[in-house]
Amino acid sequence: MSDESCFHNLHEGGIVRQLAAGVNARIFPGVNAMLSVVTIEPRSVSPVHAHANEQWGVCLEGEWIRIQDGVEHHCKAGDFWQTPPHVPHGGRTLDTRCVVLDIFAPPREEYRQAGSGLGDATLAR
């Protein structure tokens, strides 16, 4: 791999994917892990879903309500969390936008291309 393909900026680039209305991601895939910079607009919802990948998240900007395994957690800039495989999770913003850095291991293969939706994740009921 060239140096150019190994260095990125949080504010630009990546593979663009609309996860839900008002929830947009820029994805940076690697061999064994994947980073996703997710911008969640005010009063938007990331549907509760589950997938086989472990996921870590860091709230970079703003605040939101993170729902994990049926429990609501108020997260603000600087907070981070771990979501084990197959645990239902999602969230919603309040009056301001939120930016979250998600880390997936292994990478979510369906996120290696631009598109929309949550890929092969199972929507929780």
Locate the predicted segments by residue:
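Glycine- and acidic-residue-biased ligand/ion/polar-headgroup-sensing regions
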Residues: N53-W64, D69
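Conserved short histidine dyad/triad with adjacent acidic residue
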Residues: S36-A50
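Ligand-binding loop in jelly-roll beta-barrel domains
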Residues: P85-E110
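Histidine-centered active-site/metal-ligand motif
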Residues: H49-H51, Q55, H89
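Conserved GNAT-family N-acetyltransferase fold
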Residues: V38, G57, W81
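Short strand-coil-strand connectors
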Residues: V31, I67-V71, L94
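A short, N-terminal "cap"/entry segment at the start of jelly-roll beta-barrel domains
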Residues: M1-N32, Q113-R125
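Short acidic-glycine-tyrosine-enriched beta hairpin
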Residues: G70-P85
